[in-house]
Amino acid sequence: MHTAGADGRQFHGLMADPRIVEHHRLVSFDLPWHGKSPPPEGAIQGSWRLSTDLYVALIMGFIAAAGLEKPVALGASMSGEICLELAYRHPEAFTGIIACEACDKINQRQTAWAAHPQVNQAQFVPEWIRALSAPQSPAEYVDQIAWHDGQGGPQVFFGDIAFYSDEWDARERVGRIDTNRCRLFMLTGEYDYSCTVELSEATAAKIPGVRFLAMKGIGHFPFAENPKRFAEYLLPILAELKG
């Protein structure tokens, strides 16, 4: 599942990795208002606001419509957060869940500039998020992340961050996630200053049975900024879940 303001193109690197696709089928979808998924008919431009309940409903609806049987859920940033919610609400629906760059509450990442009528969001948003990638990540992938985020519609990124760093608050429920019903993995890049390793680790400490790992040489967009390096962390987990 893609990050804020982006779309499924973030997974092209993983989908082109023969080590992964030889044994696994990867499926990515665009949220409404993102990528190839248009806004609902009659929706007012700039009105998109993501919430926990809406996000869960969209994901579970997609799984049902696509006929996926107990998939492995993978997300980062806002989609990493919702992975925690999926583990809490629907553990029976998944073989495993991999929540990257996620914690139970993120503060101070919402920015009014992303919705200001006098600010060019196509220029502002890419620069707001560019430094979240690790310095070792290949420039071509970092540039692609910025390009994707710059193509979002008016206030789409803002509406996503309204969930990521405002509405989302799982501090009172992550401790009730049952990892006996669904195996849960949390991975966070060492260069992520939005959802830091410390924040993720503190959340993981509340969840009995979770597996937490800090990723070296990776920032906030693991599967998009450095898919080859991220695959080194992902492949052992997929092998474990498959076995």
Tell me what each language-model feature is.
Residues 4-16:
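The serine-hydrolase catalytic nucleophile loop
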Residues 22-74, 232:
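Active-site loop/oxyanion-hole signature of alpha/beta-hydrolase fold enzymes
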Residues 75, 79, 83:
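Gly/Ala-rich beta-loop-alpha elbow adjacent to hydrolase catalytic centers
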Residues 84-125:
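Flexible "cap/lid" loop of the alpha/beta hydrolase fold
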Residues 108, 121-179:
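Conserved alpha/beta-hydrolase catalytic His-Asp/Glu region
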Residues 190-195:
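Acidic catalytic loop of the alpha/beta-hydrolase fold
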Residues 210-243:
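Catalytic active-site module of serine/aspartate enzymes centered on a nucleophile-bearing elbow/loop
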